[in-house]
Amino acid sequence: MKGLTLACIAATVVAASHAMTTIIAPIAEISTTSSPSTTTINPLLQSRIDFEISRLTRRLERRIRGLQVGSGRLDRSITSLQRELDFNNAVLAQLPELIKNIMINNPTQRLSSRTVASIMRSVQNAATKASNEESAEVEDRRRRAIFEVTSSIVIVEGTTDSTTTTQIPEVTTQEVDTTTEMVTTAAPEQEVTSTATETTTEMTTQGTTLPSFLVSRINSVVSRIGRFFQRRIQRIQRSLSRLSRFRPLYSRLIDENTSALNNLPLLVRGLVTSPFQRRLRLSQVFRALRFRLTITTPSQPDVSPMSVRKRRQAESAEEDDDLVGDMEDLKELEQEIQEALEEVEKLDV
């Protein structure tokens, strides 16, 4: 009886041991593959992260290119406006003399602002052309002198050794008095009255006194066209002031988008917590960058995507667009720039 009991106990122990072995083995395998030293990201999550990085990279690159194009167009517009402002200031400064010279030859001609501007541009173009021709002539003389000096250098090859000697003839320079006597003739003083009602003031040109009716007409034309150019200058200055305010904004947006592009992989890894979550918006990436969130890789123990998400939602729960900071106003900004440019185009007389 005792032998039978011992046999039953032994069989029970063997069966229990076999059952424990079949249960413990898979657990041992699981614990081995999931040890902290060999933890790997879920392939689905990694694929989603790579997809978001690729998609947002393309969007950021397009946005940066668009901002750079807009910034370049803004700079060209400001340069063009500044050049136009300088021209109109020059016209306004020389307007009395210009009107007087025109009306002396054509007293009955009715002058318009377009005619005056066209004449002034012709004068400036002629002066620029003369200056360019003078510069080209000076450069041509310099090159000719260099050629004459270098062409007189004689190279003599030695016959006793392999050395080559260069003989440069002595160049003597003679001081030549290049001072040009300039004879200036003092032009008679020319006075233009500031109002059209003063007919007693005399205007002279080359010693000849102009009739009072011509003086009055000249003053009237100067006053009329001068007011037009003054209004034109004020409008250009207002447009310049409006456009100049956009320069730092464009620069800041380009810097912010470039920074987001450079840090995009790290930001996406911290924001993508599930392979099945909604697509990331650029606003989420920019908020993480703007608030200096510490986003690390998921394999490190200090990552807390839930706290990041809660903080992001607390900062801006209602913001649901793809804009960052002042990017919400980018369309309004571009519209304002377009209005300023259209206003400048209307300045053409």
Curated annotation (Swiss-Prot):
Coarsely, its chief localization is secreted
Residue ranges that the Swiss-Prot or TrEMBL entry lists as coiled coil: 316-349
Q: In which tissues is it expressed?
A: Component of the acid-insoluble and acid-soluble organic matrix of calcified layers of the shell (at protein level).
The cellular location(s) given in this protein's UniProt record come to: Secreted
Give residue spans, biased composition: Acidic residues: 316-326
Q: What is this protein called?
A: Threonine-rich protein
Could you list this entry's UniProt keywords, alphabetically sorted. Answer: Coiled coil, Glycoprotein, Secreted, Signal
Any single Gene Ontology cellular-component annotation = extracellular region
Q: Which organism is it from?
A: Lottia gigantea
Glycosylated residues? N257
Give the region (Disordered) as residue ranges. Answer: 300-326
In the UniProt record, the signal sequence range is 1-19
Q: Which taxonomic lineage is given here?
A: Eukaryota, Metazoa, Spiralia, Lophotrochozoa, Mollusca
